Amino acid sequence: VNKKHLVLLSLGIYSLSMPLMVQATDPIIPIAQQEQLQQDRDTQRERSLRLDEERVETVASEPALIDVPSDQNGASFYIKQIQLDGMPKELSFLNKLTHKYEQKNVTVSDITNIRNAFQRKLLDKGFVTSQVYIPEQNLNDGILQLMVIPGRVEDIRYSESSAHGPWRTALVVRPGDILNIRDIEQGLEQMKRVSSQSVTMKLLPGKAIGTSVIELSIKQEKPVYGSISIDNSGLESTGIYQGSFTTSFDQVFRANDTFTMSLSGDLSGSGSIKGTRAASLNYIIPHGKDTFSFSFSKSRYHQMIQSNPYDFTYSGKSTTIKAKWNHVWSRTQREKRAFDISISTRHNHRFVNDTEIPVQALRTTSMEFGVSNRKYIGNATLYSRLGFQWGIGAFGAQPEHTASVAMGGPTSRYHMWLADVDYRKPFVMGHRPASFTSSFHGQWVQGGKRVYSVDTINIGNRYSVYGFDGEYTLMGDSGWYLRNEVASVIPHLNTEVYLGLDVGAVYGKSAEKLVGKAIAGTAIGIRGNYASGLLFDAFISTPLYKPQGYHTKKFYSGFTVGYRF
């Protein structure tokens, strides 16, 4: 047996029995840990995008609706039926309101208030230019007639100083449609998703009665932009100092679409000793209430393992492809509900001196369905999402090792619940603007099954629980973490100081041999984002609670410095 086969055999046996006690000195764990670290970065990036999403509000002139006191001494009429004339099917929800006022005696002032109730219902549903009128009529037959005049879109045009940016893939409405302000808000949100353009909208009266013109004002900047940054978020085993370069291209097909390319890697210059490399491509395109995104990412990690009698290079590479569809199915002035469906494939391979270890190869496919809700409570924002993810045997996924699963081994055909909750509340601290942010993330595997390390939840780094250097983390099949932050702006320095307090826990079969299952930590930091393009973030953190035997620094400091262009 040659030395390569000895190494492969020992690593294969070790990989079957290793617990998810992630420690950088173990020969196999750092690669799995590096893959999890990259996923944690992606999760944090998605969380930041959710929290920073701009609220889209439109201001439209609404008719003044003043209820009139009921005239008890005036003439009254018995209303058997309310008849809505001229009402299109899009406004048929008004029919549900008629029963409330039928089979009653009403006065003239009551009739005005009934009309106001129908008008308020239209406004509540977003039909701000549709009107309800009381025509002349004889009420002796007990039928109250109300005339419904739908407000329609006469035209969609640009203002004189506006850039002629594309709107057809973003706006749901077209000329001739009944105008709903919620549909316009959805379109503006899709157009504002493109970072290089800002959009405002006005409703102007049309030439015909009951029609409106949507006037768009678009300002566009350079469609190519990006950033370069350096941080110390990596691992000792594969390179602490990491560099990244990201560039985005807007309006690739003039459809309010964006293509983004990212490259990252270690800056250690250690050659074959250790290192990381990663690249990703992402494309997103809207279509009215739908948003489609496609992503491809590839990463590779390696380290030199000092072993007796032979040193060897242990490496891993991972490829992930994901497609996602998001659909907004309900929208009000203060709430937005959506569902999303995604499918992703992931191929993981491990090598010793460029020879693959077959027992550690992993090819999986998963699907996910989620429902989300974004609610505005005053000036606060509450986002919540509940998702269900399950492994399937399609698109090149490897067969399930049923015998291994029966003996307690990991499964790729899992069923997992996912939950995310984000809350942000701006307030004033003394005389300075401030904010409180709280974010929860959790996953629960049904049936208590064990999953592969790439599907576990990982806590103990700057992206999950502050206070820990990430060299030793806790992984579990199920688990959660809660991140809390209070931040205050220093206006004259254009910076923000923040205090973080995090806690997390892991559970499941993979966590049974851990030194503990819960940790907590805190951090204080400062960050800035300047008009010149310079950005930075620096913090110092410490554990508040860790199990006995959990090895980490008493104080851990982290930084990110970069430049936007």
Whereabouts are the PLM-identified features?
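C-terminal outer-membrane beta-barrel translocator/porin domains of Gram-negative envelope proteins
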Residues: 351-495, 500-503, 507-508
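Outer-membrane beta-barrel "beta-signal"
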Residues: 247, 323, 526-528, 553-565
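Transmembrane beta-strand segments that form the barrel wall of outer-membrane beta-barrel proteins
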Residues: 224-234, 245, 256-269, 279-281, ...
